[in-house]
Amino acid sequence: MRRSVFASLCLLFLAGASAQEYSNNAEQNRRLNALAKEYPSLTSLQSLVKTNGGKDIWLLTIGSGKTASKPAIAVIGGTEGNHLLGTEMAIGFAENLLKASGSDSIKNKLAKTTYYIFPNMSPDAMEQYFAKLKYERNGNATETDEDRDGKLNEDSFDDLDGNGRITMMRVESPVGDYKTHPDDARVLVKADANKGEKGKWLLLTEGIDNDKDGLLNEDGEGGIAFNRNLTYKHSTFMPGAGDFPATEKETRALLDFLYDAFNVYAVVSFGANNNLSTPIAYNALAARERIVAGYLEPDAKANSMVSDLYNRVTGTRDAPKSVSGGGDILSWGYFHYGRYSFSTPCWWVPKAKPDTAKKEKAFSLDDPAANYLRWAQQQGITNTFIEWKQVQNPDYPNQKVEVGGLEPFVLINPPYKMVGDIVKKHTDFLVKLADQQPEIDITNLKTEKLGNGLTRVSLDLINKGALPTHSKLGERSYFLKKLKVAVQTDKQEVVGGKKISLLSSLDAGSSVSFSWLIRGSGKISVEAGCPTAGVKNVEVTL
């Protein structure tokens, strides 16, 4: 009996401990399978493929009824392996949404909208957070020869101070281009030669030149990064990008599914790219290039509208600027998939104001590490900076070498105790985003008897949503189905007007009128819509 009670207490302790930390791959799988088991009528969980590291790429579909026939939002987490928050956001959103599925508002939402959730597109890389040697990694388990010397993974990081962390390494050198931060000696910043400043340190990642080719840590474990492996502006042959677009099984699995999912009208990804806090501005020159390189003006306006919604709901501010490196999911979602595409890191280190009570002064030089350390101190967060420690490095036999700096992951992943509130805000945003979706309706239906067996049928087709049925760029794409209006008859005959009409798009709040002359009696039906905006069907008695 005592042994049983003790075992139960241990299990409760372990459950509580795991609840206070980011989820590893096994825990992610457990949470997803628990949702599928608890909500079988609202969910479908499938593994699209296994990575080269043997980990599942999951797709969790949430919705009621025929999910493939309703407008959908694709939610993508784990776009970068070092961004654990993105996967917590995706799974946490699913948990919050399903927990509230008994309420009328969410029940109605899931009757009209489908969510396709890809919780983690970088499971191989993300496990490095939980490994014996902890460092930030984005590449999967595919073996690569980054330095093109015919050898694989021969020059990885080395844990010189033996603390199980890979941080930074500074080498005292007369040609060093880094100096200590004027307001925080723990931090190194680049010396400004234009101001006559001189550096004292070389700043490198912790390790040794194992293959003696003059390069440091250039060919270690961690192959292809998902968020560099997509098709738009792919950086071919660059480290982490792959020799050509979509080389990886997980990339192809996502693309194969989404290109067949004609009902997706928006893609929301969690990662380093950000067009939600600050929308992408319209650039007329880029938009007019032969190969479109900028958002078309109506799509930039849609981005701005959704950005306003995001900022109102989440209350975020002071977002860092983001620049796409090519091959990323945000750019692919718009330029190649033709959908409304949004991305956010969900959290960033707030700007830390000086504590006047402690006689702190504003930083004379902005730096992310210095700002983080001040913010962490104000929040009572400890153990996130590793003091500089002198080590021996055979590459620098007669020089002072020190290892230290910020703990891996802390600049882009908040303390786990903050995650719940961040997930709640982004759940609210994703629910409210569905309120903006395009929605087709038929109004002003009229019939007029003209004699000789003829009846005029007229109606207005409207888009009740806040977004157009298609992005402007998407109007050019094969991978979006046009808006179709079709008259379905039995023995009747359409003698005036097109029996089937196709429209490229219908703007938010706009309408278009249709009229037909029908010979015959009885009942006909008119079906109108498209996968991204839903289908409406009305029956007409002649």
Where are these regions (language model features)?
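N-terminal signal peptide c-region/cleavage motif recognized by signal peptidases
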Residues: 14-15
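Short glycine- and acidic-rich boundary segments immediately preceding or forming the N-terminal edge
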Residues: 20-56, 419-422, 429
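Metallocarboxypeptidase
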Residues: 44-45, 56, 76, 88, ...
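Active-site/substrate-binding loop(s) of hydrolase catalytic cores
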Residues: 69-70, 84-85, 92-291
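Short amphipathic, basic-aromatic surface patches that mediate peripheral association
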Residues: 461-476
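Intrinsically disordered, low-complexity Pro/Gly/Ser/Thr-rich segments with frequent PxxP/GP/PP motifs
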Residues: 492-521
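Short, aromatic- and glycine-rich surface loops/edge beta-strands on solvent-exposed regions
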Residues: 522-531
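Edge beta-strands of extracellular beta-sandwich domains
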Residues: 534-542
